[in-house]
């Protein structure tokens, strides 16, 4: 192939935009040292990537899966759900109820809006330094 265009590859990948994404991803792989599957013929990496797709030496589905995997930052792993155990003894139930009653009796200090404003007014602004 003398020149590879998008038209040569459109029958392999239906969407032109997806084709460009896949070819760009493959070109980045080649620049990072991946083995090429066609002869280079003094072509640049994007042209080599398009030639690989046109010659079907690479599967577009595999390239798409690899592109998706490379873009993911957080991969969700299906973990089995924890099995809930039911309490069968009444003494255990009473101890659980006692701890919940203790939590209800806890009190927190609340600040009124006036106290908050008074505290903000009392703050001292730090001196400006030339470190910025």
Curated annotation (Swiss-Prot):
Catalysed conversion reaction: RNA(n) + a ribonucleoside 5'-triphosphate = RNA(n+1) + diphosphate
Keywords: DNA-directed RNA polymerase, Nucleotidyltransferase, Transcription, Transferase
One BP term from GO: DNA-templated transcription
Gene Ontology molecular function: DNA binding; DNA-directed RNA polymerase activity
Organism domain of life: Bacteria
Record EC number: 2.7.7.6
Pfam families: RNA_pol_Rpb6 (PF01192)
UniProt GO cellular component terms: DNA-directed RNA polymerase complex
Enzyme's top EC category: transferase
Listed HAMAP family: RNApol_bact_RpoZ (MF_00366)
Function: Promotes RNA polymerase assembly. Latches the N- and C-terminal regions of the beta' subunit thereby facilitating its interaction with the beta and alpha subunits.
Quaternary structure annotation from Swiss-Prot or TrEMBL: The RNAP catalytic core consists of 2 alpha, 1 beta, 1 beta' and 1 omega subunit. When a sigma factor is associated with the core the holoenzyme is formed, which can initiate transcription.
Family: Belongs to the RNA polymerase subunit omega family.
Official protein name in the record: DNA-directed RNA polymerase subunit omega
């Amino acid at each position: 192939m003398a020149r590879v265009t998008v038209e040569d590859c459109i029958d392999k990948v239906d969407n032109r935009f997806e084709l460009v994404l896949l070819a760009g991803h493959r070109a980045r792989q080649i620049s990072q040292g991946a083995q090429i599957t066609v002869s280079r013929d003094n072509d640049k990496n994007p042209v080599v990537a398009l030639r690989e797709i046109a010659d079907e030496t690479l599967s577009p589905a595999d390239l798409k899966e690899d592109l998706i995997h490379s873009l993911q930052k957080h991969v969700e792993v299906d973990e089995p759900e924890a099995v809930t155990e039911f309490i069968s003894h009444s003494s255990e139930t009473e101890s659980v109820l006692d701890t919940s009653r203790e939590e209800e009796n806890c009190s927190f200090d609340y600040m009124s809006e006036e106290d908050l404003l008074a505290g903000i007014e009392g703050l001292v602004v730090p001196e400006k330094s030339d470190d910025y």
